[in-house]
């Protein structure tokens, strides 16, 4: 199908065309860049909220995502879910599965669910995910939920493409909180302790709040025995932090919420907090700041992808690379020597 025809079908709201467009972007088929360039004109026009949902396996992210979908649909919002499963670089096997637990919401015409496994897509998984999110936003979705299967660097890069990142933990995560702290904990705007009816939930909440207090330069945050403070509660009130109220308007203090997704507990508060964070991003100007940073990073990623493809499309350069890889493996050449030789071949034909 020609790109112009596909764009026309998307304009008409054809769901089948949406699926084809996403496949085109995922697999970088001919015309995908033209498609994205045209759809880019519609990105940022409507108040779409991109929400990243990440956390260790077994935290109940899919169930939590399903509950969010239900809550948003009750408000009449169109919801898309991108379930990101990075592919094993060794076997090429993806951990996909069709998210069977979401079958009940997938039948809703106002819901679109897509599992992604890119098998080493050029330009990186995060770039591809963001491009797919652009297609969904241009199609008219109000909420785009980006769910990852774990907390590795790839998943964190994907989650970082969202405007709001939710880190989902379970009471059993408490033992590993110190290791999580180094990378995962820093990316979240909102922490959710799911399965909070299990022992250890309150203790984990306290540990997270103490960690957040230390990060903000206040090691003596008040710890509350209820279902997690809101951003407003934690930044205001006597004795609850010593921050300038004026400065608080331009900053967001990540709340810790408690949920039991299988029972729907805490979902209303989670939805309200997500809305509040999006409002904060808009009113503070940080949404535009993030958008500009993301677009700058994306432009560089797209340029890198184009350069890489340009090099590999040069048949002689590709043949030279294939021959020199044996030399690298044998230890007679270094990767740097070979890269320089291939680039010289592309530039000068020598």
Where are the language model's segments positioned?
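Glycine/charge-rich, flexible interdomain linkers and switch-proximal surface loops
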Residues: 36-57, 65, 87, 153, ...
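Short beta-strand/turn micro-motifs at beta-sheet edges
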Residues: 100-101, 176-181, 241-247
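Flexible active-site lid/hinge loop adjacent to a nucleotide/diphosphate
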Residues: 171-199
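Alpha-helical scaffold elements adjacent to nucleotide-binding pockets in ATP/GTP-utilizing enzyme cores
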Residues: 95, 131-132, 157, 161, ...
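Long, well-ordered amphipathic alpha-helical subdomains in the mid-to-C-terminal portions
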Residues: 250, 257-261, 265-347
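Nucleotide-state-sensitive switch-loop elements of NTP-binding domains
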Residues: 2-59, 65-154, 161-176
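Short, basic, low-complexity termini and linkers enriched in Ser/Thr/Gly/Pro
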Residues: 242-243, 348-350
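Canonical P-loop GTPase G-domain recognition
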Residues: 190-279
């Amino acid at each position: 199908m020609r790109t112009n025809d596909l764009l026309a079908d998307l304009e008409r709201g054809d769901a089948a065309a949406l699926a084809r467009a996403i496949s085109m972007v995922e697999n970088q088929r001919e015309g995908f860049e033209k498609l994205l360039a045209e759809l880019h004109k519609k990105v940022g026009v409507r108040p779409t909220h991109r929400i990243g949902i990440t956390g260790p396996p077994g935290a109940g992210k899919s169930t939590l995502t399903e509950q969010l979908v239900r809550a948003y649909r009750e408000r009449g919002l169109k919801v898309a879910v991108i379930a990101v499963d990075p592919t094993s670089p060794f076997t090429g096997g993806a951990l996909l599965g069709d998210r069977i637990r979401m079958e009940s919401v997938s039948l809703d015409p106002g819901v679109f669910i897509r599992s992604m496994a890119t098998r080493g897509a050029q330009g990186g998984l995060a770039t591809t995910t963001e491009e797919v999110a652009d297609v969904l936003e241009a199609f008219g979705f109000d909420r785009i939920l980006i769910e990852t299967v774990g907390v590795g660097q790839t998943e964190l890069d994907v989650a970082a493409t969202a405007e709001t990142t939710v880190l989902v933990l379970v009471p059993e995560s408490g033992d590993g909180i110190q290791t999580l702290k180094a990378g995962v904990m820093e990316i979240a705007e909102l922490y959710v302790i799911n399965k909070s009816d299990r022992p250890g939930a309150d203790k984990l909440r306290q540990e997270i709040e103490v960690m957040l207090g230390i990060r903000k330069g206040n090691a003596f945050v008040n710890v509350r025995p209820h279902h997690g403070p809101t951003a407003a509660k934690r930044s205001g009130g006597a004795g609850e932090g010593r921050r300038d109220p004026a400065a608080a308007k331009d900053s967001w203090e990540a709340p810790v919420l408690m949920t039991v997704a299988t029972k729907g507990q805490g979902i209303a508060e989670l939805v309200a907090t997500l809305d509040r964070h999006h409002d904060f991003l808009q009113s503070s100007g940080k949404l535009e700041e993030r958008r500009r940073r993301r677009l700058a990073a994306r432009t560089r990623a797209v340029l890198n992808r184009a350069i890489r493809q340009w090099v590999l499309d040069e048949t002689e350069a590709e043949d030279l690379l294939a021959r020199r890889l044996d030399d690298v493996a044998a230890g007679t050449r270094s990767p740097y020597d070979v890269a320089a030789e291939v680039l010289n071949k592309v530039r000068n034909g020598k």
